Swiss-Prot record:
It comes from Ictalurus punctatus (Channel catfish). GO terms for biological process: regulation of cell migration. Its main location: secreted. This is Somatostatin-1. GO terms for cellular component: extracellular space. Pancreas. Somatostatin inhibits the release of somatotropin. One of its GO terms (molecular function) is hormone activity. InterPro entries: Somatostatin (IPR004250), Somatostatin/Cortistatin_C (IPR018142). It holds the Pfam family Somatostatin. Keywords: Cleavage on pair of basic residues, Disulfide bond, Hormone, Secreted, Signal. Disulfide bonds join 103-114.
Length: 114
């Protein structure tokens, strides 16, 4: 019985310490400075909006550049695949298969000729 009380007390202590150490939002010195100024001057709210908008646009541009880089890689892979297909097509020309009379294949719910 005493060991379970000790375990519960330690678990409660761990939870309390983790709650105290975790902050709700990341701390940013510039953002905090803008917020302090906004209390004093209403024109700073516009600066805060510009700052957050500029930061958001910068993050979007960075993400877009990463996407474009991956598109270039996929395009290079596609062109490589197209080149391989052209090499295969340039190989010996095979005559089309001769169809036997009365031969039928079942394809997508219908019978087709061989």
């Amino acid at each position: 019985m005493p060991s379970t009380r000790i375990q519960c007390a330690l678990a409660l202590l761990a939870v309390a310490l983790s709650v105290c150490s975790v902050s709700g939002a990341p701390s940013d010195a510039k953002l905090r400075q803008f917020l302090q100024r906004s209390i004093l001057a209403p024109s700073v709210k516009q600066e805060l909006t510009r700052y957050t908008l500029a930061e958001l646009l910068a993050e979007l541009a960075e993400a877009e550049n990463e996407v474009l880089d991956s598109d270039e890689v996929s395009r290079a892979a596609e062109s490589e695949g197209a080149r391989l297909e052209m090499e295969r097509a340039a190989g010996p020309m095979l005559a089309p298969r001769e169809r036997k009379a009365g031969c039928k294949n079942f394809f997508w719910k219908t019978f087709t000729s061989c």
